[in-house]
């Protein structure tokens, strides 16, 4: 097996089938450009059709490939400024170091994180330190992989409380066409997902989750069908009879349109359904 994914990316293929291609209740516009010197600009804006709240963000990224460095600057409409510096494969092959900081001029709130990651065949390690006024917190994760089998552990230790505040386990199996993922969070949250690539055009996923002491099980199925190279259709439904539909069309190279709708299957004629519209420009 190649390098296993990070803990956060375990079960990602199934999650993508459930989440990508939808934007319920939002009108969204994304713009991505790249200059000749390698400077990348990404801007995003969205308006919530229910609350009419408008959010926006701007990100600039520059990669200094020769030294394995990436510089990122971020800003959003909450007036939060962020800076991220990443160095990869320089101190050691497979080692990635990131310094992430943010500052809100309105509130004076500051935040800083140091993220480390190390990956090689059969293993993926991660350790993040979040510097907070109350005291630093340490998040560590480990994923092991062998012949398609994956096992991972994630924990969060808060120095202010001197104890582990989060402890998560995951086990799974992965091939190019099939993925199985199960997880237990803090011994109370249980979940599982199955991803199946039926053929070149059709992808399906099943998701299951429940909480200890609660008989309510959450269940959902989803599918994505690539109609042609420029269009795809997505659909999903859960045990609450919420039906999600999405359609993505590439209008021309660099311009993509996404339409989505969330329907209440129990009250189809009652209204209250959510619609979404997204436009993405890339140059």
UniProtKB/Swiss-Prot annotation:
What biological-process GO terms show up in the record?
apoptotic process; behavioral fear response; calcium import into the mitochondrion; chemical synaptic transmission; epithelial cell differentiation; learning; lipid transport; mitochondrial calcium ion transmembrane transport
Keyword Transport in record: yes
Domain of life, source organism: Eukaryota
Per UniProt, NAD(+) binds at: 242-244, 260-264
The record's listing under Gene3D superfamilies reads: Porin
The free-text domain note is:
Consists mainly of a membrane-spanning beta-barrel formed by 19 beta-strands. The helical N-terminus folds back into the pore opening and plays a role in voltage-gated channel activity.
Report the protein name in the record: Non-selective voltage-gated ion channel VDAC1
Please tell me the species this chain comes from. Answer: Rattus norvegicus (Rat)
């Amino acid at each position: 097996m190649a390098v296993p994914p990070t803990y956060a990316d375990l079960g990602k293929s199934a999650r993508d089938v459930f989440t990508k291609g939808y934007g319920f209740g939002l009108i969204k516009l994304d713009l991505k450009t790249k200059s000749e010197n390698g400077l990348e600009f990404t801007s995003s804006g969205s308006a919530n059709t229910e609350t009419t709240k408008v959010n926006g963000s701007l990100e600039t990224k520059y990669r200094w490939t020769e030294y394995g460095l990436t510089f990122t600057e971020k800003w959003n409409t909450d007036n939060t400024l962020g800076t991220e510096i990443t160095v990869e494969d320089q101190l050691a092959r497979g080692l990635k170091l990131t310094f992430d900081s943010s500052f809100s001029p309105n509130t004076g709130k500051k935040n800083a994180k140091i993220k480390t990651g190390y990956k090689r065949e059969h293993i993926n390690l991660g350790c993040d330190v979040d510097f907070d006024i109350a005291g630093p917190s340490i998040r560590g994760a480990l994923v092991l992989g062998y012949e398609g089998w994956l096992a991972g552990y994630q924990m969060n230790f808060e120095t202010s409380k001197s104890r582990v505040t989060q402890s998560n386990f995951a086990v799974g199996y992965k091939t190019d066409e099939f993925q199985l993922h199960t997880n237990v969070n803090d011994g109370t949250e249980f979940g599982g997902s199955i991803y199946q690539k039926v053929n070149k055009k059709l992808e399906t996923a099943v998701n299951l989750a429940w909480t200890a002491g609660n008989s309510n099980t959450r269940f959902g199925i989803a599918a994505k069908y690539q109609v042609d190279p420029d269009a795809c259709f997505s659909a999903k439904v859960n045990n609450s009879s919420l039906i999600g539909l999405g359609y993505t069309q590439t209008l021309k190279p660099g311009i993509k349109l996404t339409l989505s709708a969330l329907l209440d299957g129990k009250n189809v004629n009652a209204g209250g359904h959510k619609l979404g519209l997204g436009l993405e420009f890339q140059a």
